[in-house]
């Protein structure tokens, strides 16, 4: 069995601020095959590497990426992070990040397109122009939850490798996993009477579930800006069978990158996608137990926050 490619999610994020040049370099030093990064658009149509639409990374700035200019974002100081001092660290532009990774021997790049909050037909062409200029060629894979943007990129650059990101089953996403219910001591409220004695516990349980659902809804909405809830639900329903969905698309797809629980819902997923010529990545694979569960399925890639440990976990799983 071929060992999966290891892609460091936003770089080595426990050693440096995520999505920074230092995080990318550390990931390769630790043995990752490549890095994943996120590109989004600034107020003045610049292209910056950052995951969330909000500024984070422990800065004192409270603002949205799309409300700031490229220059304002480049001026944000990231030299102090988690008690560690960095000589120079800032949010890289797309051009800077691609040029840097191009110079890291053997480094592949998974570049995620973050859709602009407001429609901008020129967003994808701007990204494609910089991809061409980088010279990364087949070392770059463009991925996104917004598959219409990938289609646009593929039309502009037919040789570009693209991969669709998928979330999996909407119902299974919205509620806490069974193990969490057990760990929190939660029970099905229908198992007991709604009397005064157990109402406080049920109220606490409802609060935890509501908080989980709220967080998941916020996540989903952020992945699909410009879309209504009805449109998002329809989109996710269309993707419930990834292999059938890929075959319905009007452009060729090189990779399907799935939230890893998708494989537990359909253990034949990797085989089904391989049968139609698609490689398969799972994200975000961060524990030994998950590696042990996924490895026998034959995935082509693990996207992970733990590039320091995952090869050890793979070796241990293969030795079992």
Identify the role of each PLM range.
Residues 1-320:
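Phosphate-group recognition and catalysis centered on beta-loop-alpha active-site segments
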